C-alpha cells in the first residue's frame, strides 16, 4: 500500500507536472530543440500510461512492481539518460513510420463508423420514444373510454326519481344550484289543449264503446279525436233536453164552483 502511494506521487509530480511546466517554457521561449524533446517525451509517456492500465490489473502482484515503475519514470525524464528520446528514436518512430498508412485508414474508418453508429443509435432512440408515447396514449385513451362508459344512459336512468339533481355552472360557481329533472324522466302532464271534460268524455265513451262492441261480438276500436268531441257535444245536448223534459209541471188549481142562487 505504501509503495502504491509513493509510486502514484512520483508519477504525478515527475511524470506529469514537471514535464508540463517544461513544455510551457519551451513554447514560451520558442526553443525548437526543447520543443522537440518534450514532444517526444509526451508520446512515450502516453504509451506508458496505456500499458500501465493493463499492468496494474494483471501484474501488480509482481515483487517490486511499483519500485520498477518509479525508476522507469525517472529514467524517461532524467536529462542524463534521456530515456524518452532514446525509446522514441529506436522503437516508436520506426514502428509508426511503417504502420502510418494503416493507422490513418483505421482512424478514418473509425470516424465513419462512429458517425453511422451515432445516427443509428439516435434513430433507435427516437423510435423507442415514439412507441412509448403511442403506448401511453392508447392506454390513456382506453382508460378515458372506460371512464365515459361508466357514465352511460343506463346508469343515469337508474337514479331514483325523488332525489333532485343539482347542476352547477362552471363559469359561476357561487350561483345557486339549478334543480332539474334527470334525463329520461317520464312526463305525466297532458296537453294543455285537452280540458277535463274532454278527457272524461274520451275515457267514458271509450269504455261504453268497447262494452257495446264486445256485447255485439265486434272488436273494439278506439275512438278518434273528432268522434270524442262530437260525442261530448251530443251528450251535453241530451242532458239539456232531459233537464227540460223532466221539469215538474205545476198543478192546476180546481175551479171553484159558483154557488147556486
Swiss-Prot record:
Basic and acidic residues bias: start-end ranges: 191-202
Tissue: During gastrulation, expressed on the dorsal side of the embryo and then in the neural plate and neural tube. At tailbud stages, expressed in the somites. Expressed in the neural tube later in development.
Primary residence: endoplasmic reticulum
Region (Disordered), start-end ranges: 177-261
Listed GO biological process terms: cell division; mitotic nuclear membrane reassembly; nuclear envelope organization; somitogenesis; swimming
Domain of life: Eukaryota
Cited PANTHER family: HVA22-LIKE PROTEINS, RECEPTOR EXPRESSION-ENHANCING PROTEIN 4
Note: Inactivation in embryos by antisense morpholino causes paralysis and shortening of the body axis.
Function: Microtubule-binding protein required to ensure proper cell division and nuclear envelope reassembly by sequestering the endoplasmic reticulum away from chromosomes during mitosis. Probably acts by clearing the endoplasmic reticulum membrane from metaphase chromosomes. May play a role in the maintenance of both the nervous system and the musculature.
Protein name, entry field: Receptor expression-enhancing protein 4
Gene: reep4
Amino acid at each position: 500500500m505504501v509503495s502504491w502511494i509513493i509510486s502514484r506521487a512520483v508519477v504525478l509530480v515527475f511524470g506529469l507536472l514537471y514535464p508540463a511546466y517544461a513544455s510551457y517554457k519551451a513554447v514560451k521561449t520558442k526553443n525548437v530543440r526543447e520543443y522537440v524533446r518534450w514532444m517526444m517525451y509526451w508520446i512515450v509517456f502516453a504509451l506508458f500510461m496505456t500499458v500501465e492500465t493493463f499492468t496494474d490489473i494483471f501484474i501488480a502482484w509482481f515483487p517490486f512492481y511499483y519500485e520498477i515503475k518509479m525508476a522507469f519514470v525517472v529514467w524517461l525524464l532524467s536529462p542524463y539518460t534521456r530515456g524518452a528520446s532514446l525509446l522514441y528514436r529506436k522503437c516508436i518512430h520506426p514502428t509508426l513510420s511503417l504502420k502510418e498508412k494503416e493507422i490513418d485508414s483505421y482512424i478514418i474508418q473509425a470516424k465513419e463508423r462512429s458517425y453511422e453508429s451515432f445516427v443509428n443509435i439516435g434513430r433507435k432512440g427516437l423510435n423507442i420514444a415514439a412507441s412509448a408515447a403511442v403506448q401511453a396514449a392508447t392506454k390513456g385513451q382506453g382508460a378515458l373510454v372506460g371512464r365515459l362508459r361508466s357514465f352511460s344512459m343506463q346508469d343515469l336512468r337508474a337514479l331514483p326519481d325523488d332525489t333532485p339533481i343539482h347542476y352547477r355552472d362552471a363559469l359561476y360557481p357561487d350561483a345557486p344550484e339549478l334543480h332539474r329533472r334527470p334525463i329520461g324522466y317520464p312526463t305525466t302532464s297532458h296537453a294543455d289543449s285537452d280540458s277535463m271534460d274532454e278527457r272524461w268524455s274520451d275515457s267514458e265513451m271509450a269504455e261504453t264503446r268497447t262494452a257495446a262492441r264486445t256485447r255485439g261480438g265486434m272488436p273494439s276500436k278506439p275512438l278518434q279525436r273528432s268522434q270524442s268531441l262530437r260525442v261530448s257535444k251530443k251528450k251535453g245536448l241530451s242532458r239539456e233536453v232531459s233537464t227540460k223534459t223532466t221539469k215538474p209541471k205545476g198543478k192546476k188549481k180546481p175551479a171553484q164552483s159558483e154557488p147556486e142562487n
